[in-house]
């Protein structure tokens, strides 16, 4: 009973920390976008605008949140929660340091893939419940995109799993003490990062909520706290994909001089900033190009990487 209470307290602290980090990340992103686009970005609330996310949170919480006419109210309310909750649960198996993990399960990678896949249901359910044609089109795009990119997302990380011989996050990091897997798996790392951006619905893969042709996609009819949960889920997904990339390919918490959790945080921040840089510099492709790249290019390359890794693993284990 005491252990359960301690776990609940640690979980609450972790969730609060993640919410603060996600909010701060929105400010960092807006400042970086302003720098790239030669403008200021938020600079009024707090030092250098660093508390802008707090003001935005207060604004979202005080806005009216009411389902549109003809909407399925229960599903409409549940969809935003499904967008954020699985991503928060995914952080429970992330190893932030040696022994610094909330739930040290042996199938952590598999659990994370499952949690990330659930976010597609939020988009589909929210789109269907909104009773809006633009929302429905965005939801169908989200479903097709997740189906395409979730496949080679899993295949791209299997190379690291094969080299480590385990699905445990801790074991994968420990297997990189001699050399990071990004050196042994450059193709797998690149494919994983591409699929991760698509799984998080980030530019240039944000066609499910493309403003140019779908108003706001599957979140067209959402406002207030419901919109905020979708927004939160997206930014948490970016951080989760960054943390997973660091764990699988960039040595996790391993590094000289500094404590492990600091190394993990710095590496994750670098990957997240790269995602922002991609958003600022790359154009949005056509939807047929997006799916064509997934099925015709990325999937065969993932299978090729898996085949080559299997050959190397078998050759290394041969007497």
Swiss-Prot record:
It holds the Pfam family NADHdh. It is an enzyme of class 7 (translocase). It is found in: Cell inner membrane. The chain crosses the membrane at residues 1-21, 77-97, 107-127, 147-167, 179-199, 214-234, 238-258, 262-282, 293-313. It catalyses: a quinone + NADH + 5 H(+)(in) = a quinol + NAD(+) + 4 H(+)(out). Disulfide bonds: none annotated. GO terms for cellular component: plasma membrane. Keywords: Cell inner membrane, Cell membrane, Membrane, NAD, Quinone, Translocase, Transmembrane, Transmembrane helix, Ubiquinone. GO terms for molecular function: NADH dehydrogenase activity; oxidoreductase activity, acting on NAD(P)H, quinone or similar compound as acceptor; quinone binding. Its main location: membrane. Coiled coil: none annotated. It is a multi-pass membrane protein. NDH-1 shuttles electrons from NADH, via FMN and iron-sulfur (Fe-S) centers, to quinones in the respiratory chain. The immediate electron acceptor for the enzyme in this species is believed to be ubiquinone. Couples the redox reaction to proton translocation (for every two electrons transferred, four hydrogen ions are translocated across the cytoplasmic membrane), and thus conserves the redox energy in a proton gradient. This subunit may bind ubiquinone. This is NADH-quinone oxidoreductase subunit H 1. It comes from Rhodopseudomonas palustris (strain HaA2). The gene is nuoH1.
